[in-house]
Each structure stands twice: as C-alpha cells, then as structure tokens.
Design a protein with these regions (language model features):
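Noncatalytic, basic helical substrate-engagement surface that gates or grips nucleic-acid strands
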Residues: 1-113, 117-137, 214-217, 223-230
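Non-catalytic nucleic-acid-binding/docking modules located in mid-to-C-terminal regions
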Residues: 26-37, 80-82, 105, 124-126, ...
Length: 230
C-alpha cells in the first residue's frame, strides 16, 4: 500500500480463498463443499506449553512485514462473509480436529484445506486434506507414502521421531523411517515401549528404554484434541 503497509500475505490469502470458493461453486462431485469456516491460532502459547515448557520455544517471532497483516487477513475473512473461529489456549489444529469429529459423527464429509503434515492424523474415509499450494488431495495412500503408516498410527510415529520445527523431543536418533518400522511391527507406541527390552539392536533398545518419558510427552504434544469446548 502507499502508506507502507505490506499486503503480500493478505493478497495471497485472499487469492487462495477466492479460488477455493470458485472451485467449490463449480464442483458437482459428491465432495462439493456446502459449508466453510476459517480457523485461526489465537496465541503463541497454549495448553501444550503447560505440558512441555519448551514447546515451539525455538520459533521466531513473525517477521516485521508479516505481523501487521494478521489483522487484515482476519478482516478479509469477514469481507468474504465467512465465519472464522479461534479459541484461547488451543491451536487451530485442535479446533479443526474437533469440528472434523463433530461433522463426521453427524454423517458428513470433511475437507481440511492445509499443507500441515500434523493434520494427517485426521485422515479417514470421511476426512481428507487438500494442499492448496500443490492442488493435491491427501488421503490414506498419501499419508502412508509420507509416514510409512496408516493415519491412525501417525501420532505414534511423530511421538518417536519428534519434530524439530515444533521443538518436540521424540526419541533421540529415531527418525520417521525407523519409527514407522517400529510402529508397523509393534502397532502402538505403548506396546513398543512395554516390549522395548525385546528389541535386538542394543543401541536402539537402550535409547528407547532411556527415553520412554520423552516419547510419551511427545505423544501428548502431537495428539490433536478433538473435544475442544466450542
């Protein structure tokens, strides 16, 4: 703008939203959207910081040219006449998980528009993701390609592998590939940890035994709450 206010993020957001709405109007498939909502994070800190104080502590503040645009992104949602939702002490992903549960229990399908891999745990025969940057639908097949396990096991893989971008510790030395191998064999994180003494590889066995608490804390951090009081 002429007054120096950056508008790149607002413009990009509005363009994406406009395209989604236009595509929805022309969609004649069984997945044609009937309801829209935009969900925001309400603050940097939430209940996960009470579980693990270093959660997302490595995240830098929003760049100076981005921070002032958040207000206008919210106003643009109003201009599109769409509802927006945010709730103190919860992340947007928790609200998405809660709405997805409520909607599917009511018998409808859900499309979550996001490229966030953390939402892949929600994928089911009634919930799919849509990555607007790649125009790609993400279902069970794509989740398996990404994590090596089915959607309902993604949480356990993330609990082991951790996530440096969110400062989630996981188990040191275990990445996504190894985590997927372990979860495919032992089915759940809890079963793996209970049977860790049976693991033949000495280093892996000792690492798991020494870091059980980190794995379980990580599970609390990566698990999206689907019972948020909306």
């Amino acid at each position: 703008k002429s007054d120096g206010l950056p508008t790149g993020a607002v413009s990009g957001f509005c363009s994406m939203l406009f395209k989604l709405l236009e595509d929805a109007r022309s969609d004649d498939s069984k997945n044609k959207p009937t309801h829209f909502a935009v969900i925001f994070d309400s603050a940097r800190k939430n209940f996960r910081n009470e579980i693990y104080t270093d959660y997302k502590a490595n995240r830098a503040e929003a760049p100076d040219d981005l921070a002032p645009q958040f207000e206008y992104i919210r106003k643009s949602v109003e201009a599109f006449n769409l509802p927006s939702v945010e709730l103190l002490n919860y992340e947007a992903d928790d609200l998405i998980a809660t709405y997805a549960k409520k909607i599917t229990e009511a018998g409808a399908r859900v499309t979550v528009v996001s490229s966030d891999k953390d939402l892949m745990q929600l994928v089911s025969n009634k919930v799919r993701l849509f990555d607007p940057m790649k125009s790609k639908v993400i279902g069970e097949k794509e989740v398996i390609e990404k994590f090596g396990v089915k959607p309902d096991q993604v949480i356990d893989v993330q609990s082991l592998a951790g996530d440096s971008s969110d400062n989630i510790p996981g188990v040191p030395g275990i990445g996504v590939k190894t985590a997927a191998e372990l979860i495919n064999k032992y089915k759940t994180l809890e079963n793996l940890l209970n049977k860790a003494t049976e693991i033949p590889q000495n280093k892996r066995r000792e690492t798991l035994l020494l870091n059980k608490d980190k794995a379980m804390i990580s599970k609390q951090l990566v698990t999206l709450k689907n019972d948020v009081p909306l």
